Amino acid sequence: KETAAEKFQRQHMDTSSSLSNDSNYCNQMMVRRNMTQDRCKPVNTFVHESEADVKAVCSQKNVTCKNGQTNCYQSNSTMHITDCRETGSSKYPNCAYKTSQLQKHIIVACEGDPYVPVHYDASV
């Protein structure tokens, strides 16, 4: 079974491309990372930074998560991210996404030993 840390890697990490100017990026990646299997995941963010840099966020600025938990952390610096949002015409199983390139601070929830990101909370 996939651990929470592994799920975070699958759903949110893309170290291979620093920036993809490809408007088709989300359509391809959401399928490739199994986020369109039983439904279209409505919103998802990919982070284009090294695994080490993203794991390091767990020791940066402690903030409160959207759900009220206190194990969220905001990155000190901005990161290259891609936002994938389902389009109005998207209908399972033909999930369709709009791709947006952004440079923002990320907020992740961390847990475990080693203390690693397990949930992508927001970008600011």
From Swiss-Prot:
Keywords: Disulfide bond, Endonuclease, Glycoprotein, Hydrolase, Lyase, Nuclease, Secreted
Tissue: Pancreas.
Top-level division of the source organism's lineage: Eukaryota
Catalytic activity: an [RNA] containing cytidine + H2O = an [RNA]-3'-cytidine-3'-phosphate + a 5'-hydroxy-ribonucleotide-3'-[RNA]; an [RNA] containing uridine + H2O = an [RNA]-3'-uridine-3'-phosphate + a 5'-hydroxy-ribonucleotide-3'-[RNA]
Protein localization: Secreted
EC number annotated for this UniProt entry: 4.6.1.18
Cellular component terms per the entry's GO annotation: extracellular region
Molecular function per GO: lyase activity; nucleic acid binding; ribonuclease A activity
A Pfam family this chain is assigned to: RnaseA
List of catalytic residues: 12, 119
Disulphide bridges, residue numbers: 26-84, 40-95, 58-110, 65-72
Residues carrying covalently attached carbohydrate according to the record: 34
Stated role: Endonuclease that catalyzes the cleavage of RNA on the 3' side of pyrimidine nucleotides. Acts on single-stranded and double-stranded RNA.
Protein name, per record: Ribonuclease pancreatic
Organism: Hippopotamus amphibius (Hippopotamus)
Gene: RNASE1
